[in-house]
């Protein structure tokens, strides 16, 4: 194979997957060049629909007529909570609760804590909003951003809680 592959990829997938996958692909197909388009999943779907990219890689399935979807992996979303928040909420039981939350957290415990989320229109955000709605949870939203790295950095700095794909947290 040779030519140019116009690849659309979400920011999150690009950061988490490209460094691992691209070298292997290039080793197997050295004559293929890439033209990379990064954006949120909704924008990438539009690019695909209008023929500006050949394929897209994103975390959540797309529903477009005439498009074949090939699942590569299943990705869980993670609640990322600053340590200071669990200390504040649970006091002496904070360490015990952090261990318990490793298997899943009851989001209601964080009802009055600040949240930092990806902007609406992003598929991850759509999934998060659906979860909130099903659980009658209204987050105290203090910041929305286009960039998952920003949400993670803010959580790490103790500014707020965020939710993002598991693979991204491990990166």
Q: What are these model-derived regions, one by one?
A:
Residues 2-65, 145:
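Central regulatory/effector-binding core of bacterial HTH transcription factors
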Residues 26, 68-71, 99, 106-108, ...:
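Short secondary-structure boundary/capping segments
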Residues 40-44, 49-53, 58-59, 123-171:
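Hydrophobic hinge/microswitch elements
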Residues 56-60, 82, 118-119:
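Short beta-strand elements of ligand-binding domains
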